Amino acid sequence: MIGYLRGRLHLVTPEGILLETGGIGWLVRTVTNRSWPAPGTEIAVYTQLVVREDAMELYGFTRPEELHLFTLLRGVNGIGPRGALQILGAAKPEQLSRAIAAGDSAFLTALPGIGAKKAQRLLLELKDAVLKSGLVDGTETEAIPAGGGDNDEALAALLALGYSREEIGPILARVRQELGNAAPTTAVLQAVLKTFGRGGGD
């Protein structure tokens, strides 16, 4: 099993990087929005080899926390390695871990490729694993309200993303006024994130 590679960054591709080590070029799939240093720079990645019937693919991450979450996500029914990589490209490990530990389905459904049913499955299968892994302090989940209404769900998701209540309050109120109180949480989140310049979309 290849768990770690250190070498010279040879090329950044649309799907990852080409890492040269010992005269061998390793094609490593990574999150597509990662900022990499200039070619020729020495870097290190934590890796996992995924073996399929028709191919072997190496996935790499700059932090061990990302690799651990990637492994956990792959274990959820309906989430493959590329789906897990897409999720990790949309949320930082700390944000994703807090959302899972807090049972925050609103945050999860705002991520690409995750609908309501998949979010519930993810929470059911990973909440205990995330809490036991040390990826998140159990006390951090207390800051996220349990929810009950759409306002609470949207607020919880935005808090999990790292925004403060002071930042969220006025924008969330304006979006609610524009979209109406019956607007689904996902639509509210997308509108708020667009205001912050982070976009939305499924």
Swiss-Prot record:
Record InterPro entries: DNA_helicase_Holl-junc_RuvA_I, Hlx-hairpin-Hlx_DNA-bd_motif, NA-bd_OB-fold, RuvA, RuvA_2-like, RuvA_C
Molecular functions (GO terms): ATP binding; four-way junction DNA binding; four-way junction helicase activity
Residue ranges, annotated region (Domain III): 146-202
Keywords: Cytoplasm, DNA damage, DNA recombination, DNA repair, DNA-binding
Location of this chain's protein in the cell: Cytoplasm
GO BP term, pick one: DNA recombination
Subunit structure as annotated in this protein's UniProt entry: Homotetramer. Forms an RuvA(8)-RuvB(12)-Holliday junction (HJ) complex. HJ DNA is sandwiched between 2 RuvA tetramers; dsDNA enters through RuvA and exits via RuvB. An RuvB hexamer assembles on each DNA strand where it exits the tetramer. Each RuvB hexamer is contacted by two RuvA subunits (via domain III) on 2 adjacent RuvB subunits; this complex drives branch migration. In the full resolvosome a probable DNA-RuvA(4)-RuvB(12)-RuvC(2) complex forms which resolves the HJ.
NCBIfam families: ruvA
Function as written in the Swiss-Prot or TrEMBL entry: The RuvA-RuvB-RuvC complex processes Holliday junction (HJ) DNA during genetic recombination and DNA repair, while the RuvA-RuvB complex plays an important role in the rescue of blocked DNA replication forks via replication fork reversal (RFR). RuvA specifically binds to HJ cruciform DNA, conferring on it an open structure. The RuvB hexamer acts as an ATP-dependent pump, pulling dsDNA into and through the RuvAB complex. HJ branch migration allows RuvC to scan DNA until it finds its consensus sequence, where it cleaves and resolves the cruciform DNA.
Notes on the domains: Has three domains with a flexible linker between the domains II and III and assumes an 'L' shape. Domain III is highly mobile and contacts RuvB.
Identification of the protein by name: Holliday junction branch migration complex subunit RuvA
Organism for this UniProt entry: Moorella thermoacetica (strain ATCC 39073 / JCM 9320)
Lineage: Bacteria, Bacillati, Bacillota, Clostridia, Moorellales
Gene field: ruvA
